[in-house]
Curated annotation (Swiss-Prot):
Entry's Gene Ontology BP terms: adenine salvage; AMP salvage; purine ribonucleoside salvage
Disulfide bond residue pairs: none
Binding partners and assembly: Homodimer.
The reaction(s) this protein catalyses: AMP + diphosphate = 5-phospho-alpha-D-ribose 1-diphosphate + adenine
Descriptive protein name: Adenine phosphoribosyltransferase
GO cellular component: cytoplasm
Gene that specifies this protein: apt
Organism from which the protein derives: Prochlorococcus marinus (strain MIT 9301)
Amino acid sequence: MLEKNLKNTIKSYPDFPKKGILFRDILPVFQNPSIFNKLIESMIDKKIYRKSEAILAIDARGFLFGSVIAYKLSKPLILARKPGKLPGKLSTYKYDLEYGSNSLSLQDDSIRNLDNFVIVDDLLATGGTVNSVSKILKDKDKNVLGLSVVVELKDLNGRSKLNFPVESEIIY
């Protein structure tokens, strides 16, 4: 039932943000509190969270889900931010997107005393974004217990580039 509700709620925009991309817009989920609540409950029910010490949310839509999940599970929330958004000593990794490239950074102090993370984002496409964060964590001898996303774009094969469990609520 949740999958059907999500498919009816998530909107698709062809050729956005550039020609050839079919953009899946998850923002309408937030306009329906019942669906949003069921989505969060489904996400936090996954085994990957059981041994996690912290939730690592990816800029920017991952923050929307990661913050609620961290709150519900009483776990610290760590933010992976785009360039120029974090102060202090940072670890940064550049990655390729479905439609370009970017980089993400973590504050070194935010992960210093933690070892086991679940990464949360809105969508898994090519895997580049998630891989960049997992490489930062692995370089710091940290463990990624899994990835939790709302949407997975199966044709872009991002799951195959990751060496940890992936939990998707809906697959296109």
